[in-house]
Amino acid sequence: MAKKEIGKIKLQIPAGSANPSPPVGPALGQHGVNIMEFCKAFNAKTQDQKGMIIPVIITVYQDRSFSFITKTPPASTLLLKAAKLQKGSGEPNKNKVGKVTKAQVKEIAELKAPDLTAADTEAAMKSIMGTARSMGIEVTE
């Protein structure tokens, strides 16, 4: 018989550095999950992506066991890294804070493809360009 699911937890955690402190500890603790077991498994799975923020969906079962799925880093994080910025513009319509090329946008779109609902790479690129525009990052040829 399949395990009974009692909850899903969505978190964004820096790769390879999950620890029991907030936000991880309280989120898992209220579902009765072994926090250190999750931290060790997550850190082992994401150690090659250090420095990136990784969204994770944790499924908690009735017997207090869990499974988790890691997603690709958020488009905003990838755009900031490509433009070599710390943060986006506070006024994206007035202040442009950086530039990325179409080639970089295509690279990000291909990396994000499994998590996007876009039909093809072109549509994924448009989605990423929209994110860039809302962050005050200019897309150049």
UniProtKB/Swiss-Prot annotation:
The UniProt keywords, alphabetically, are:
Methylation, Ribonucleoprotein, Ribosomal protein, RNA-binding, rRNA-binding
What the entry lists under PROSITE patterns is as follows: RIBOSOMAL_L11 (PS00359)
Q: What Gene3D superfamilies does the record tag this protein with?
A: Ribosomal protein L11, C-terminal domain, Ribosomal protein L11/L12, N-terminal domain
Per the record, GO CC terms?
A: cytosolic large ribosomal subunit
Q: Which GO annotations describe the biological process of this protein?
A: translation
Quick check: keyword Plastid in the entry?
no
* SUPFAM superfamilies the UniProt entry points to: Ribosomal L11/L12e N-terminal domain, Ribosomal protein L11, C-terminal domain
Q: Which SMART domains match?
A: RL11 (SM00649)
What kind of modification does the protein receive after translation?
Answer: One or more lysine residues are methylated.
Q: Name one GO molecular function term.
A: structural constituent of ribosome
Q: Do the record's keywords include rRNA-binding?
A: yes
Q: Which InterPro entries match?
A: Ribosomal_uL11 (IPR000911), Ribosomal_uL11_bac-typ (IPR006519), Ribosomal_uL11_C (IPR020783), Ribosomal_uL11_C_sf (IPR036769), Ribosomal_uL11_CS (IPR020785), Ribosomal_uL11_N (IPR020784), Ribosomal_uL11_N_sf (IPR036796)
Please describe the quaternary structure of this protein.
Part of the ribosomal stalk of the 50S ribosomal subunit. Interacts with L10 and the large rRNA to form the base of the stalk. L10 forms an elongated spine to which L12 dimers bind in a sequential fashion forming a multimeric L10(L12)X complex.
Family under the similarity heading: Belongs to the universal ribosomal protein uL11 family.
> What's this chain's function?
Forms part of the ribosomal stalk which helps the ribosome interact with GTP-bound translation factors.
Q: What is this protein called?
A: Large ribosomal subunit protein uL11
Q: Please name the source species.
A: Maridesulfovibrio salexigens (strain ATCC 14822 / DSM 2638 / NCIMB 8403 / VKM B-1763)
The protein's gene is named rplK
